[in-house]
């Protein structure tokens, strides 16, 4: 189902601020929240380092129906896939039908910081796919036409790379998985999820996009409408090969926006995210936010920064850019606002923008 949701930035705001924002978002009519999952923030100045899993439990308790998805949890090093499966199963028991998991191949700021290596993107995607396999086995996740990892076709150039995978589930539901990177032995979630938890994967490279199509319920991408056609063609093709119904899979965007009647204030409020415009920002082996921030100041121009964010002085001016995302094929759009006054943004967006799209969808 097409939806416009809210984005909660764990790196930019305190836990209490985000609780206030999301409570306001629910009152305003938003039904789901996508939220980041970092150890370090993208920028040192005014950065925060909230533990997302704790925050999700706190905010779910303080809201009534709002759904929460991580965007994304790195299933590569610092989080063991068994612990991810256990944590989100427990959240789903407490808040059934309101919890989703987004996974990805991580950033150096969160993995290298805690003593782990930073290998190639190819290896990180391989690790992520193994993690997905373990999580789904432990959840006993139901899905039609699900491919086991050893049968994967997501990386045709490495057809034999996963040939040593060994996975089994006994009659009592105990999982044993011997992989290239991860191993669990006779593991069972004694507190299993109460629902079929949605599972998504972030990706921009070929291998990650194919893996998202074959192994998860949808793709999270930072691609913009004008550059996403090839991404979606690759995603749809991989889904068809896996005998999946492409119409059942989500294509998720999270456009950055900033609103203020004063353009200069709206632009200034985007500064925290300048680091994300560094070349290869998501792959670069820099784990210190201070270094990232200084590098961004040197290398990312104001013009580049302005192009990275939809900056508006009238809230209605967000309608056209959002329509472009929908026309490009995105099914869910999470609005990543970095506005100077976030509460004002939420209230105005809910009065002027959300009703426009809901009326449009009703008539369709």
Regions found by a protein language model. Give the residues of each.
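Active-site-adjacent structural elements that line small-molecule/cofactor binding pockets in enzymes
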Residues: 1-364
């Amino acid at each position: 189902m097409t939806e416009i949701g809210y984005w909660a930035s764990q790196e930019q705001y305190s836990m209490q601020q985000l609780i206030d924002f999301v409570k306001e978002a629910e009152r305003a009519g938003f039904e789901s929240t996508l939220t980041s999952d970092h150890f370090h923030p993208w920028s040192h100045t005014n950065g925060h380092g909230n533990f997302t899993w704790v925050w999700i439990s706190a905010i779910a308790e303080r809201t009534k129906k709002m759904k929460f998805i991580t965007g994304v949890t790195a299933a590569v090093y610092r989080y063991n896939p068994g612990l991810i499966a256990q944590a989100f199963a427990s959240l789903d028991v407490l808040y059934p039908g309101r919890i989703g998991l987004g996974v990805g191949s991580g950033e150096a700021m969160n993995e290298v910081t805690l003593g782990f290596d930073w290998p190639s993107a190819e290896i990180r995607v391989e690790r992520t796919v193994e993690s997905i396999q373990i999580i789904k086995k432990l959840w006993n996740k139901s899905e039609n036409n699900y491919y086991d990892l050893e049968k994967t076709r997501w990386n045709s150039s490495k057809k034999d790379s996963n040939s040593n995978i060994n996975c089994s589930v006994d009659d009592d539901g105990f999982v044993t998985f011997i992989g290239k990177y991860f191993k669990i032995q006779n593991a069972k979630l004694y507190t299993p999820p109460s629902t079929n938890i949605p599972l998504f994967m972030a990706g921009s490279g070929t291998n990650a996009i194919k893996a998202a199509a074959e192994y998860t319920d949808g793709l999270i991408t930072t691609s913009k409408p004008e550059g996403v056609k090839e991404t979606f063609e690759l995603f749809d093709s991989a889904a068809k090969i896996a005998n999946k119904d492409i119409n059942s899979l989500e294509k998720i965007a999270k456009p950055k926006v900033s609103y203020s009647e004063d353009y200069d204030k709206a632009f200034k409020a985007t500064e925290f995210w300048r680091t994300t415009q560094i070349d290869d920002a998501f792959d670069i082996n820099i784990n210190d936010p201070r270094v990232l921030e200084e590098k961004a100041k040197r290398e990312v121009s104001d013009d580049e920064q302005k192009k990275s964010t939809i900056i508006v002085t009238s809230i209605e001016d967000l309608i056209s850019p959002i329509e472009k995302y929908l026309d490009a094929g995105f099914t869910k759009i999470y609005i990543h606002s970095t506005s100077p006054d976030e509460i004002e943004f939420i209230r105005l967006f809910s009065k002027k923008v959300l009703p426009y799209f809901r009326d449009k969808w009703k008539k369709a």
